[in-house]
Amino acid sequence: MSEDKMNGRSIRINRLPATIVAILLTFVLVYFLNFHQEERPAIYGMLRSENPSRVNLRKMLIAAIQAAQRGGLEVLDVARSRQLKERSKGKTDEGVNDPFTDADGRSHCVMKQGLQRIFPRVQIFSEEDKEHCKQAHGYDLDPTVLHETAQIPDVTVNAQDVTVWVDPLDATKEFTEELYEYVTTMVCVAVAGRPIIGVIHSPFNGQTAWAWVGNSMSEYLSNLHPQHSPNNQAPIITVSRSHTAGAKDLARGIFGENVSLLTAAGAGYKVLQVVANNATAYLHTSKIKKWDICAGDAILHALGGTMTTLNDQLINYGPEESPVNTEGLLATLEQHDEYMDKLSKYREAHNGKLA
């Protein structure tokens, strides 16, 4: 207790209630910080100190989903503005214009910078790495993007074993033509060269397909994939719109006269057609960049499917490897060996060529 003199009278101040209030506030703060981390995305990633040489794959999954979705918002914003500022990066091997737009650049900056800020020791490759980002971008981890699934474990790996592949806008040509159904943003996480986390986000329908091999997948992806495939289904091969010329004859030569062809754009979109059983295989006979296919490779693997080169080799996504897969690809959910056997026999009969 203490006494003060005021107007000649003695006033007694009791300090006990203030002490009790301070103690209660301290308990409330400690409880909030320790038991409500999942509800506080802005501080979630900062509350636990981690070994900087290790990477938490659960957090990386969260960040990958957020990156793809945030990149998608940039794509939508540019599309709505109709200020694409399109220019050409040159011609593809098929002689098709390879365009670049503000959507590619803005999505790249948001996606790569956001991921790099959270995981500074991880190597991240983006299709638009040459693009200069005029401002810094970042975001805090938001675990609510996993709300639709059961508990996902905390697994850590060596940061030096992790490689991230980012495609800020897949199917840019179709984006410029307003064929928005083909457009996706993608993130893939590879560990020791193998893809284990894949995210394919479709900005124009707002759906995100993601999977972590051996752990979990998004509800959307699970619902997209039918439980049972039709018995004795005739082959349906999805190929690129730019490869349509001659593709049907090639598909018939490899898989038989009853084959059907599904022409589409965007590697991410074509993988989702295989997942949904709208196609039984995705065939690509020329070179393709790894940021185009890594996320789809991980998703197919999580569902029990397979993606290989046309030489039947798994694709290595390690940091020391070339970013270009020069050996084509075959992606399936089922019957991969059977399809590969037919392809091999066709090549043998045509002096090792697929044309």
Curated annotation (Swiss-Prot):
It catalyses: a myo-inositol phosphate + H2O = myo-inositol + phosphate. It is found in: Membrane. The chain crosses the membrane at residues 16-36. Coiled coil: none annotated. Substrate binds at residues 127, 169-172, 292. Pathway: Polyol metabolism; myo-inositol biosynthesis; myo-inositol from D-glucose 6-phosphate: step 2/2. One of its GO terms (cellular component) is membrane. Mg(2+) 1 binds at residues 127, 167, 169. The keyword Hydrolase applies. InterPro entries: CysQ/Inositol_MonoPase, Inositol_monophosphatase-like, Inositol_monophosphatase_CS. Its cofactor is Mg(2+). It holds the Pfam family Inositol_P. Its EC number is 3.1.3.25. Mg(2+) 2 binds at residues 167, 170, 292. Keywords: Hydrolase, Magnesium, Membrane, Metal-binding, Transmembrane, Transmembrane helix. GO terms for biological process: inositol biosynthetic process; phosphatidylinositol phosphate biosynthetic process. This is Putative inositol monophosphatase 3. It comes from Drosophila melanogaster (Fruit fly). The lineage of its organism: Eukaryota, Metazoa, Ecdysozoa, Arthropoda, Hexapoda.
